[in-house]
Amino acid sequence: MSVVARQSFKYSIIGYLGFLLGTVSAIFIFPFDMVFYGKLRFVLSATLMLVPFVVFGLSYSNVYFFGKAKEEGKHQNLFSLSLVGVGINFLIFLLGFYAFFYIFSSFQEDSELWDMKRLILPMVLVMSLSAVFNRYISNFKRIVVPNIFENIFPKLANLGAFSLFFFLGASEKISYAFFLGVFVLGLIG
């Protein structure tokens, strides 16, 4: 079996496992407390909505320009530049985020986004960096590992944070810290 065929098979298996984990959790576990599960889903959805503003296509530029940069021996420079770009974009995004809520201060009172900013903003940075790493590693025909981080880890984060909160009686802050910690672990991995 070739490398591509093995990677494709493993990719499919990970996808099915992610589907199975999500389905079992949604049917049997999350209905115990839909309010807290809704908060977790809001945080993840808001984060996923804001990540493209920070990444701004830099993750896909690693795939698109990788061949040319590798020919010139500068593919590591392209990767480093992408990481610096994400850092700069995140700072600009933070400036815009706080400027928006400063200018339109009435949104601060009724906005869940503003209330959850201490969790959402670090997750935006972590997931933006993860997007760059995941696309970069795909240049080396390694698609299974990023698929684990993109499909399995969010479901494990939801399930773990929910279980900590509902079944083990941990506070929301501890559950949110676990939720963020799983994504940080995915970035480190």
Which residues does each predicted region cover?
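Alpha-helical transmembrane segments and their helix-entry boundary regions
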Residues: Y11, Y37, L78, R135, ...
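Helix-loop junctions and terminal segments of transmembrane helices
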Residues: V55-K70, N139
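Membrane-interface helix-capping segments at transmembrane helix termini in multi-pass transporters
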Residues: F32-F42, A69-L81, L91-L125, F167-F179
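Helix-capping/transition residues at the boundaries of transmembrane alpha-helices
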Residues: F30, G67, S138, F165-F166
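Signature of the first transmembrane helix
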Residues: V3-S59, L94-Y98, M123
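Membrane-interface junctions at transmembrane-helix termini in multi-pass inner-membrane proteins
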Residues: A5, F65, M127-E150
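Alpha-helical transmembrane segments of multi-pass membrane proteins
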Residues: M49, F53, E109-F133, V184
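Hydrophobic alpha-helical transmembrane segments
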Residues: F149-L164, L168-G189
